[in-house]
Amino acid sequence: MTDFLRDDIRFLGRILGEVIAEQEGQEVYELVEQARLTSFDIAKGNAEMDSLVQVFDGITPAKATPIARAFSHFALLANLAEDLHDEELREQALDAGDTPPDSTLDATWLKLNEGNVGAEAVADVLRNAEVAPVLTAHPTETRRRTVFDAQKWITTHMRERHALQSAEPTARTQSKLDEIEKNIRRRITILWQTALIRVARPRIEDEIEVGLRYYKLSLLEEIPRINRDVAVELRERFGEDVPLKPVVKPGSWIGGDHDGNPYVTAGTVEYSTRRAAETVLKYYARQLHSLEHELSLSDRMNEVTPQLLELADAGHNDVPSRVDEPYRRAVHGVRGRILATTAELIGEDAVEGVWFKVFTPYASPEEFLNDALTIDHSLRESNDVLIADDRLSVLISAIESFGFNLYSLDLRQNSESYEDVLTELFERAQVTANYRELSEEEKLEVLLKELRSPRPLIPHGSDEYSEVTDRELGIFRTASEAVKKFGPRMVPHCIISMASSVTDVLEPMVLLKEFGLIAANGDNPRGTVDVIPLFETIEDLRAGAGILGELWKIDLYRNYLLQRDNVQEVMLGYSDSNKDGGYFSANWALYDAELQLVELCRSAGVKLRLFHGRGGTVGRGGGPSYDAILAQPKGAVQGSVRITEQGEIISAKYGNPETARRNLEALVSATLEASLLDVSELTDHQRAYDIMSEISELSLKKYTSLVHEDQGFIDYFTQSTPLQEIGSLNIGSRPSSRKQTSSVEDLRAIPWVLSWSQSRVMLPGWFGVGTALEQWIGEGEQATQRIAELQTLNESWPFFTSVLDNMAQVMSKAELRLAKLYADLIPDREVAERVYSVIHEEYFLTKKMFCVITGSDDLLDDNPLLARSVQRRYPYLLPLNVIQVEMMRRYRKGDQSEQVSRNIQLTMNGLSTALRNSG
């Protein structure tokens, strides 16, 4: 840790401590300090965990609340200081002229140069380029805007403090530092007196607003900037023939993901699409208002194009002071039309005033873009390139990036639900009596007949369906209305989770056809929506390529693909595959599935686009996005990658413009490098694949023996983690299980991983790997040879390196001494001790095998920055865990008072903040 960062954390911690003493009293402050110092002693090995348990022995729920809040705030401020420090280190490296680090565009340009990548290859990749971060909801990401605002202001004041500390001191330096400290104290006081989390269970609408907040915080500005910068750079390096298309195209699941969530309805689809459009239209209006003030250029000073004059004359801005200012008059008219568009699409209440009513709304984003390009062209013709390259160029890039939709809203539902809906529709329409009971061949015949027929299934005005079917139909109906209003980019994807057959993929196409998103035309249907199978269990991942191969033999579907640019998108589920088969088996099943899909697409002449359903944690496919994309098989990226972003990962990546820029750059850099360069140094691919397959089977066997076969495991899991509390408290809008059952299979991936991370076991991110590696390596001379093989793979193959590195990262955040406290909550002591012993033994075996393969002495030897980060936040985590265990004990004994419930939520959110990737 650098002196600056240590100083910042101590500085912010001191102020927080003083605020706590002032607001809560000396007794609370002293208990916080005692817990903090004890935690540091434990971290240094100078005390046992029991000493912290003793600190909180007998603590009342009322006294526990400010302690939980204190350590949650410590974690929040430590994150803030760390982010600022990382940002400043990068700035210093740039100032020093250091070699650009990996995951930056500057580094990517150098690599493309060194790799002698030609313009034709770049152009080919960019024609279908799409880098799509897709924001999804998460139960612990419930921070309020007030908290974000406070963080933003504290960061601003800390930057001011650093600038003063780095500058030559003057007579006023100390007084300025005192003023900054006063401002920070004020903000921390406001933060302390603000509720960190909402009282009520968040509604879908609340989660939509949280997602939109990141656009206002960073993405509205940074996505257009990075798209503009990439386009300009590639044109300069590779020539005018390189297509200028926006690369980053954001998406969202919030409001459209109805898989297992009955609260997603037609109303949430309408709300999500309308609020997205309103957000981007108001952004355009603000930018145009600023441009109108900035572009004071007089036509007495320079010439303008006839097209610009025509636009100015249509601007209805004939005040005398602007008679010689055609740009202002032109922009005024464009702004009027955008406001008129907002009033038409969103409603007149969304726009202040009436002056815009003389203007005609834009019919499309393309019409708006043409007007902006008219202004741009005129500026460039008169040698005002510097002016054109500023705000106007960002606005043009924004229009190309966002249209009138801002993001693309995905619809997602599981295959079983689609089958249920069609069973009811087909029965009512007298197509077939019981579709669900038909064979696969019979279902296929029914579906193809319906897809070829323009006849609607639903009689006009009919509403006599079951509640579930009516809700599903309402979602598709509203999606169709949103597309008509905001354009085809508003809802361009329909995802089928748990897809395991050809008919699973075709079923939602019937519903899309019913509401006009697909038009029947014999074997040549036309549509604006990609139908995307999601393969997520180990079995389905293995079968995925075979399913697509059969699907592509159907002329109707193959022709539909052709009019969708011949692109087949496939979503890969990291979460359920991990829950199904464990960390290593899931990772290999995903990689192997990609190998098969790449080969299938190559032989069939179909373009592949992969959508990676990654969570925040390693157990759900998390880890650095840059490394994850580079770890894909050759041919799996091809300029396009979609990837889910959620929870604390969203706030960590996109909570401010600097981190947003960095993370968007990482996605684009990795996509370009994976598409255009050979990043793997494997010499014998088949041998590497055979090794992974063998280790995967051994890992699956170990994982299955505990998670799916041990009779006591379900009791251990449900009773030693906060799973019950996640289900019963107001944490997230989505139920924690798909069905009312206690099986691991039906449990949702987020509560599965979130529960293990809260109890500090982190089991989904490593269990089974140690045994698998030890058994595969064996003993004696064979062991020496096989260790060498694995060491070579770790040095030469990004996939294997990424698997090990991500595992080490998550294991470094585990703390089995705390896990033992959670295990003590289990009434059946035999189950508790037996399962804990299995977990404990496997953890240390996995750590040992990791060190053998990597040649390390500890988990994070190769990542000192992350190691220091984990060490810094460790002491803030311990008190939160100990308090959580005590509150869970009370809750389960019947004390389900608001104070106890609130403390459990506080500790869950505090731990999520400190861990930064909880579920």
From Swiss-Prot:
<dbReference type="GO" id="GO:0006107">
    <property type="term" value="P:oxaloacetate metabolic process"/>
</dbReference>
<feature type="active site">
    <location>
        <position position="579"/>
    </location>
</feature>
<dbReference type="InterPro" id="IPR018129">
    <property type="entry name" value="PEP_COase_Lys_AS"/>
</dbReference>
<dbReference type="InterPro" id="IPR015813">
    <property type="entry name" value="Pyrv/PenolPyrv_kinase-like_dom"/>
</dbReference>
<dbReference type="GO" id="GO:0008964">
    <property type="term" value="F:phosphoenolpyruvate carboxylase activity"/>
</dbReference>
<comment type="function">
    <text>Forms oxaloacetate, a four-carbon dicarboxylic acid source for the tricarboxylic acid cycle.</text>
</comment>
<dbReference type="InterPro" id="IPR021135">
    <property type="entry name" value="PEP_COase"/>
</dbReference>
<feature type="active site">
    <location>
        <position position="138"/>
    </location>
</feature>
<keyword id="KW-0456">Lyase</keyword>
<comment type="similarity">
    <text>Belongs to the PEPCase type 1 family.</text>
</comment>
<dbReference type="InterPro" id="IPR022805">
    <property type="entry name" value="PEP_COase_bac/pln-type"/>
</dbReference>
<dbReference type="GO" id="GO:0006099">
    <property type="term" value="P:tricarboxylic acid cycle"/>
</dbReference>
<keyword id="KW-0460">Magnesium</keyword>
<dbReference type="GO" id="GO:0000287">
    <property type="term" value="F:magnesium ion binding"/>
</dbReference>
<protein>
    <recommendedName>
        <fullName>Phosphoenolpyruvate carboxylase</fullName>
        <ecNumber>4.1.1.31</ecNumber>
    </recommendedName>
</protein>
<dbReference type="GO" id="GO:0015977">
    <property type="term" value="P:carbon fixation"/>
</dbReference>
<dbReference type="Pfam" id="PF00311">
    <property type="entry name" value="PEPcase"/>
</dbReference>
<keyword id="KW-0120">Carbon dioxide fixation</keyword>
<dbReference type="GO" id="GO:0005829">
    <property type="term" value="C:cytosol"/>
</dbReference>
<dbReference type="InterPro" id="IPR033129">
    <property type="entry name" value="PEPCASE_His_AS"/>
</dbReference>
